[in-house]
């Protein structure tokens, strides 16, 4: 057993509550020890919605266990009286699993109508966030989806959008805009914003769209099997993937429409998808070919995220921005085979599959890429290494739950991602200029005073600031002149240059790094 902290995936409760908190008229009762309802704070802090999380806790106490009683029936009655939900989902905890409590039996004695209760008996020890969320959503679809008359006009369902989803609202807005441009109606978005009645209407649509591999795909497969509803599983991240996504939707809708005599849908002019209706829908194709972006072809990137994002970002960085992907990975072991198939030919080595952020940080430190696309964990790791990092996937923090329109999906999303890649790699240039040029002659007296203070401090410690030596991270000694030259290297690649120079010096049998050794290392490494 190892200490669990900084987890990439939350518990099964996280997944269950992401589904129920997304929906209208659905409530979760968590049968667990007091304190396990901390998850409500996550939603109130990050979600930025006026509603309080639809989650209550049925406390498991030692005294109750000793007396052979359970608070679950009373809690269910209180939830029914106070919230009047259409459905209450009862979620087990590790404690109830260890105690082997029969939640169905306890729920049956609550006095609440059984059709308004659902025990989602997932194993809390083995099942984590995404699997629990996908499983519960699929169970809800199986329970409530019903045969109905098909929509008279082309209509689709958007599946897998959940509470705490990455850039959720902006991604939905981007998809709605593109579908509206096609003349396609959105029948139901689920689970986000959907009620029980909306789940019943799912089969009325012509097509299901499930862009996330983690959540929604299984439900779409069930609807395809039971109601003969075709589905599109592609993720529209990037310009070319978005075009393929649109063509796939048009093709499948026209197949359905041909059976009911509907007029075929055709691809509109591309400028119709732009925000102003007049220009190209995305600036990425020409932006990637500008002189400024051409230099990105030599930059190295590392990606670590959930399955959907890892696949999409690796392809976007290489295919559309021309960057060199030196490695990629995911923390979702159950989706690793799918990621491997999707990224065949894209990676120089094996896909990294781990849920230990320390292992990911070690790879980043060894590779020293120019850009990392990852999670909140990689943001922290890269901050210590002075490596640019952009968060592209859960787990995230509050700065990734924005009020503005910053989608990752669609043409608009391609522009947002390209901007962030560019800024993440370029930000810090002003810091380098200050490092390089100093105060440029401004506030000269303060600069002299600071220099004198530094000289005095160095002398007091027995060091010679001008000609002294320092020891590098690898144990290699650097002369003062070599250190001064190293400081002229931009800070965001300085660590890499130091490491490469020390490696060169050791290979050449040098005992210390001098200016001459530094210059030879630079020439040898093509710098």
Curated annotation (Swiss-Prot):
The free-text cofactor remark is: Binds 1 [4Fe-4S] cluster per heterodimer. The cluster is bound at the heterodimer interface by residues from both subunits.
* Signal peptide per UniProt: none
Active site positions: 292
Can you state which reaction this protein catalyses?
chlorophyllide a + oxidized 2[4Fe-4S]-[ferredoxin] + 2 ADP + 2 phosphate = protochlorophyllide a + reduced 2[4Fe-4S]-[ferredoxin] + 2 ATP + 2 H2O
Q: In which pathway does it act?
A: Porphyrin-containing compound metabolism; bacteriochlorophyll biosynthesis (light-independent)
**Which InterPro entries does its entry note?**
ChlB/BchB/BchZ, LI-POR_suB-like_C, Nase/OxRdtase_comp1, P-CP_red_C, Protochl_reductB, Protochlorophyllide_Rdtase
Cofactors needed by this protein, per the record, are: [4Fe-4S] cluster
Residues reported in the UniProt entry to bind substrate: 428-429
Per UniProt, [4Fe-4S] cluster binds at: 36
Cite the entry's keywords alphabetically. Answer: 4Fe-4S, ATP-binding, Bacteriochlorophyll biosynthesis, Chlorophyll biosynthesis, Iron, Iron-sulfur, Metal-binding, Nucleotide-binding, Oxidoreductase, Photosynthesis
Domain of life of the native organism: Bacteria
* Pfam families with a match to the protein in the record: Oxidored_nitro, PCP_red
Top EC group? oxidoreductase
Q: What is its EC number?
A: 1.3.7.7
- Gene Ontology terms for molecular function: 4 iron, 4 sulfur cluster binding; ATP binding; metal ion binding; oxidoreductase activity, acting on iron-sulfur proteins as donors; oxidoreductase activity, acting on the CH-CH group of donors, iron-sulfur protein as acceptor
Which GO biological process annotations does it have? light-independent bacteriochlorophyll biosynthetic process; photosynthesis, dark reaction
Q: Which family does it belong to?
A: Belongs to the ChlB/BchB/BchZ family.
Which PANTHER family does this chain map to?
A: LIGHT-INDEPENDENT PROTOCHLOROPHYLLIDE REDUCTASE SUBUNIT B
Q: What does this protein do?
A: Component of the dark-operative protochlorophyllide reductase (DPOR) that uses Mg-ATP and reduced ferredoxin to reduce ring D of protochlorophyllide (Pchlide) to form chlorophyllide a (Chlide). This reaction is light-independent. The NB-protein (BchN-BchB) is the catalytic component of the complex.
Question: How does this polypeptide assemble, per the annotation?
Answer: Protochlorophyllide reductase is composed of three subunits; BchL, BchN and BchB. Forms a heterotetramer of two BchB and two BchN subunits.
Query: Could you tell me what this protein is called?
Result: Light-independent protochlorophyllide reductase subunit B
Species source reads Chlorobium phaeovibrioides (strain DSM 265 / 1930) (Prosthecochloris vibrioformis (strain DSM 265))
Taxonomic lineage of the native organism: Bacteria, Pseudomonadati, Chlorobiota, Chlorobiia, Chlorobiales
